[in-house]
Amino acid sequence: MKMKAMKTIQIWMLAAILVCGISFTSCDRADNPTGESTVTEFQHELDQALSWAQVYGPPTQTLAEEVAARHKGKTTPLNYKTRESTERKCITDNSRPFELKDLARTTVLCEYDSIRKVIDDVTATATERGIFGRYRHQTSDRGYWGDLFNLKFQYLYTEIQVKSYRNYYAANPEDICRPVLGDSLYNVIHTESGVEPGLSHFYYEIIRADTTSEATREYYKKLCIEYHSHFDPDYVD
């Protein structure tokens, strides 16, 4: 309890320092500067955004764990986007650090039949706490589907995904998904699906990286669709 209290104090001390010592922008970005900025200004804003992610990550994880517990589910460890990944994303999307919504992120995992209940619970809990930002059901022509929430804190959004156990297995290699799922559940999914974990993301990365060969993209797209057929179908008709 003492360690938990100390961690909470440290988080809010960081928040106080940021509020007092740094000039930052709102989550809505209405007051953000537009146009060109210097590298120094961008790096300063990047520092701020990454620091706020450290503040808002723990309450995001707490909400996810509370919801998971109510539905006999699990959560992944809280994950923070790295500085390098954040900078690359800003360049690729022509965006600013505070516009990114996944600098702190986690995932609620549950049985396929519980997904709708978990989604309703995350929505209700986040709304009750005044931090509901948005919800999206995501699909793709590669067979992938999933559900994503963004929690809206004062200065930054964070992310909670909702996945079935089997679709989490499909998206992550063994060294990531086995510790989260546990040996027993991992082995059940491995036996029932008859395929190795993590190929969904593996195929996606190949498709995304190859921008020249339509034939290559189509080949891996078909592999991805076939791979997803071994797991839970999209619950949205």
Residue ranges and their predicted role:
Residues A16-V19:
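Repetitive helical segments and hydrophobic/amphipathic motifs
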